Amino acid sequence: LNAALGALLLVSVGARSALAQHLPDLVTTDVLRVCSDPGNMPFSERKGGGFENKIAEIIADELKVKLRYYWLTQGPGFVRNTLGTGLCDLIIGTSGGDIIQPTNPYYRSAYTLVTRRGEFAGVTTLDDPKLKGKQIGLIAGTPPANRLGELGMINDTHSYTAYAFGPDRKFQTVAAEIIADLAAKKLDVAILWGPSAGWLAKQSGVEMDVTPLLKEPDRPPMAFRVSMGVRLNENDWKRSLNTALRKRKTDIEKVLRDFQVPLLEEEENKPLQSSNE
């Protein structure tokens, strides 16, 4: 293990680009080492099929380096045991935190209302009377759960734990389980983070509507900016990534749209027009 760790942390002292000359010693300069979950579709998977995998490929291409992953299942301690150990240098998608330094945001999205096609046509807010008494599935501790509590609808909700571990789990993620229960009519409605909801709904085998929650009060927030994450104080590395994100903005947006990620304008809760329009 020590030998492997040492190999991962080696940095060549040979001729490097300007990028390499200004990076902290902990960041490797010939390989983009990404911290990622091996089974968290549509975000990431070991086969490289997730949209964060595709975005990592774009960044590696822009930096002219190879791509390597350090795999760890998402859960408590993910950042500490990935970035914090020095075994990888970049988290592709994060909304920030005390022990992580975010790059500039590269997309903004929102929580969504997911229903079977046509069953709740016209419903765009959580206080809509049509939702009263309906069976609503969501992940415990998320902003929509707080909002439903404020509305006195908590008794109608089915709260799923945020993480599912163990060999007996039937679904790769909790969000996938919720969508499966919606498809099976165990739920009337699901409320999920948009970047996972769109793709999972499309994969469910049942036609579904995915409606971003754009008209809710500012608190609790339903829309969030997503950045990449690096270690604290790695400012040169962050600036290099910001440059790559800016240069490849159109490519990244295409990947997100291909995975049905609801994209919002930077400041307003309005759908983002395609850069190709």
Locate each region found by the language model.
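Bacterial N-terminal signal peptides
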Residues: 2-12
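Extracytoplasmic small-molecule ligand-binding "clamshell" domains
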Residues: 20-98, 168-172, 258-259
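Short amphipathic alpha-helical coupling segments at ligand-binding clamshell hinges
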Residues: 51, 55, 132, 232-251, ...
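Periplasmic-binding protein-like
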Residues: 37-38, 108-120, 162-165, 202-245, ...
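Acidic, polar ligand-binding/catalytic clefts
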Residues: 57, 61, 66-130, 141-142, ...
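Alpha-to-beta junction loops
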Residues: 64-66, 83-93, 134-135, 177-178, ...
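Ligand-binding clefts/hinges and TM-proximal coupling segments of bilobed small-molecule sensing domains
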Residues: 22-24, 72, 143-166, 242-277
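Bilobed "Venus flytrap"/periplasmic-binding protein-like clamshell domains
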Residues: 33, 38-42, 46-61, 113-174, ...
